[in-house]
Amino acid sequence: MCFRTQLPLGRGKGAFRACVDGQMASVFKTYREWKISGDTQWLKQWWPTVKSLLEYAWSEKNPDCWDRDRDGILEGRQHHTLDWELFGPSSWLEGMYLAALEAGAEMAEYLGEQETAVRYRALFCKGYTYMKESLFNGDYFIQQVDLSCKDYIRCYDCPEYWNEEQKQLKYQICQGCEIDQMLAQWHAGLCGLGDIYDKQQRQTALRAMFRNNFKTSMRDFTNAWRVFAILDEQGTVMCDYPNGVQRPVIPIPYVDECMTGFEYAFAGLLIQEGMVQEGLQVLRAIRDRYDGEKRNPFNEIEYGSNYARAMASFALLPIFSGFAYDMVRGHIGFTPIEKGTFRCLWSLGPAWGEFFQEAACSTIVIRDGALPVSTATLGNAGKIVSIWADGENIPFAQEGQTVRFDATTVKTTLRFETAL
């Protein structure tokens, strides 16, 4: 895939090199859209393309050799959304690769390609083990790279990445605490992909990120890049180098900036992992900066006005509602962070509506479309005593937080009454 879509649409393909995080995300976003829609025919149509996107990582046609030796570890020249390249494994891009492998394995398995699924999962396991053992420094996840090694420059013919004065690679994370070091886990939580990073390690890393990257004041913080937070404003910086760890002379681009799209994803991951107050603090810092007096609340600037990445804020809706979905198997679920009365919007391919959580019942209301469903998870409901689909009482079986019933297409309401 080309790094950027050419606009306006119809101009044709760009000629720039492929982007690791964008290409891998296209794989698991396909998985996400399949689960949202339940449209397996659509998946079958695009599956050959999706496979080629994932397998480009080790393809001989890939001049950047992301995973040429097929060991599940990204080691080549890795272009990314921050506009330059990383050399050597990083938890950020490795995580995106692992999420794509996991999504690819599940899609392959469903489509009957068992051998493909086995290959993808074997690569996932190798990469997961490497990341757990070699990319976690005991406090947070890092990039493994030798800044003094000029072999990368020779191998990929990219002299622009070498700082001759300092004899050092440019634009690398190295030992820094980077805001996207577990971005793939945020995506995985939204898509239902499970663990991409070790649970205990990611909890430790999130605490370190909040401690190091979240700044309660910018007065004593030096930022030579673009200034999106000043004076007593709070914000989360892109990459911090705590406790005297080596900071490259020319580190990863935008290293000291506060950009809301990245901050929203970080806040979302904090909340997904149970660190709700920390996540809310990150969110309040953003909204305080864009309060309508200091800055336009409808234009959170990153690389320019109305930059799309700020729409990561919309992920907070499924995160706070604990929204789970799988239209392929007819499943929907809600486990709101708020245990009491709660109300939210939900949206899937076949239908959209509202969810209401109350003391004695939980109700899924369909505002448009029809919802084909046979299982539901209600994380806060307790024991279900009756289920009503479009006003009709239906039989069911409950296993923990999940209820199962005969497949039905709900057109108005699906109501779950609970024992008090």
Where are these regions (language model features)?
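Long, well-ordered core segments of solenoidal/helical folds
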Residues: 1-6, 46-71, 122-140, 153-168, ...
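Aromatic-rich carbohydrate-recognition surfaces in CAZymes
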Residues: 1-77, 85-108, 121, 128-131, ...
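Solvent-exposed loop and edge beta-strand segments that line ligand/cofactor-binding
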Residues: 10-23, 81-95, 166-184, 194-195, ...
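Alpha-helix C-terminal capping/termination sites
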Residues: 36, 109-110, 191-193, 269-275
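Acidic/polar loop patches that form or flank catalytic/metal-binding clefts of enzymes
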Residues: 116-118, 130-143, 195-204, 216-221, ...
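Extended ligand-binding clefts on enzyme/binding-domain cores
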Residues: 132-256
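Non-catalytic C-terminal accessory modules of carbohydrate-active enzymes
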Residues: 229-232, 252, 257, 263-399, ...
